[in-house]
């Protein structure tokens, strides 16, 4: 259960170590760095950068957001539950379960289908994002800078209730000129301007393809996972690896992390894995690992289905591996649920 987004990626920018103020990756936040009333620079415009901007804009004297790529922003509707509604959930737990099920189905049938090729649903997603931008940002010059040149959801779709409002505050600046280098006093862009800063935040994302690495994992006959995954990361049903008995992953390669709720995904994968573990616990088998032919068939089906997905429409993102292959789930939510309902033991090598 090593997760996906936990290996920070640092930008290849000259002079970062020369910066005189506090500089840190957003995932390695320096809580000792004072922020109130300071000049803050944020490099990056992904989900983390958007959240930081929204949170800090009312606390700092100036915020410079350095943007390389504009992002689509989906409006967030997240109303608080009233005390009366919460009491209903306490009195009738099934009501909460029913709400969860209805929201899961709604998301699966809309966004979940949009990303795998449902053109009607994708048009709705993109129309909503575009309307959010046009309704929220009146200045045409700023709106043009914030308009992406790729299809919505090709990169990870950002959901935010307040980013557009934050970036339009008097103490906010969207910087789209490329960064030349970092200096002691701030960030110099290629137009020659020095953006003077007290704190520099590197919201530059994560390596989404390392998974449990650099942890050493040695399989049967001394096979090293680093060698198996040297070119691309693959697994059988995102969970098991041929030649690595009794090793199972949550949210492994090609899990639907860009499609559905990560919590729901993990719970269903865990239920599947526990059925395999029960075979071992009950003494039926000593070793369980995916068959190579089963894994090959699964990964071939994934590759064949990727052509219809939004992730191959031309943008660059961590959804793609170094060869440009999407590491996502190209099927429906229902197929994922069916696949995770029970393991097909014919797909596994079982050693007593």
State where each predicted segment sits.
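A conserved short coil-to-beta-strand element within the FAD-binding core of flavoproteins
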Residues: 29-32, 170-190
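Central helical "cap/lid" subdomain
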Residues: 10-25, 188-239
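Short beta-strand to alpha-helix junction loop
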Residues: 116-125, 150-162
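C-terminal active-site-capping segments
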Residues: 121, 264, 271-352
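Rossmann-like dinucleotide-binding core of oxidoreductases
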Residues: 5-138, 172-173, 195, 224, ...
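FAD-binding beta-loop-beta segment adjacent to the flavin cofactor pocket
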Residues: 13-17, 32, 158-164, 217-248, ...
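Short hydrophobic core segments
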Residues: 1-5, 40-43, 63, 179, ...
């Amino acid at each position: 259960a090593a997760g996906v987004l936990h290996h920070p990626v640092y930008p290849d920018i000259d002079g970062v170590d020369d910066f005189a103020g506090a500089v840190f990756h957003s995932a390695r936040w320096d809580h000792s760095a004072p922020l109130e009333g300071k000049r803050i620079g944020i490099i990056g415009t992904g989900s983390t950068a958007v959240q930081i901007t929204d949170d800090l804009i009312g606390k700092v004297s100036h915020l410079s957001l350095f943007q390389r790529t504009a992002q689509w922003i989906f409006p967030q509707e997240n109303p608080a539950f009233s005390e009366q509604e919460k009491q209903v959930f306490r009195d009738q737990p099934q009501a909460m379960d029913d709400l969860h099920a209805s929201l899961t189905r709604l998301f699966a049938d809309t966004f979940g289908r949009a990303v795998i090729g449902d053109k009607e649903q994708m048009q709705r997603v993109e129309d909503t994002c575009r309307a959010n931008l046009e309704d929220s940002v009146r200045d045409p010059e700023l709106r043009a800078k914030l308009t992406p040149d790729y299809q919505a959801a090709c990169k990870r779709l950002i959901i935010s209730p307040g980013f557009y409002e934050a970036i339009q505050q008097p103490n906010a600046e969207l910087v789209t000129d490329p960064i030349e280098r970092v200096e002691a006093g701030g960030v110099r862009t290629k137009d020659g301007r020095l953006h003077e800063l007290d704190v520099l935040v590197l919201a530059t994302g994560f390596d989404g393809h390392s998974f449990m690495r650099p942890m050493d994992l040695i399989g049967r006959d001394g096979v090293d996972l680093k060698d198996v995954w040297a070119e691309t990361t693959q697994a059988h049903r995102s969970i098991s690896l041929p030649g690595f008995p009794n090793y199972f992953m949550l949210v492994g390669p090609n899990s639907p992390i860009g499609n559905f709720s990560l919590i729901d995904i993990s719970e269903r994968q865990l239920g599947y894995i526990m059925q395999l573990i029960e075979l071992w616990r009950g003494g039926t088998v000593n070793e369980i690992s995916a068959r190579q032919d089963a894994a090959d068939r699964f990964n071939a089906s994934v590759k064949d289905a990727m052509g219809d997905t939004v992730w191959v429409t031309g943008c660059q993102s961590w959804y793609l591996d170094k060869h440009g292959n999407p590491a996502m789930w190209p099927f429906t939510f229902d197929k994922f649920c069916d696949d995770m309902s029970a393991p097909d033991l014919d797909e596994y090598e079982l050693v007593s």
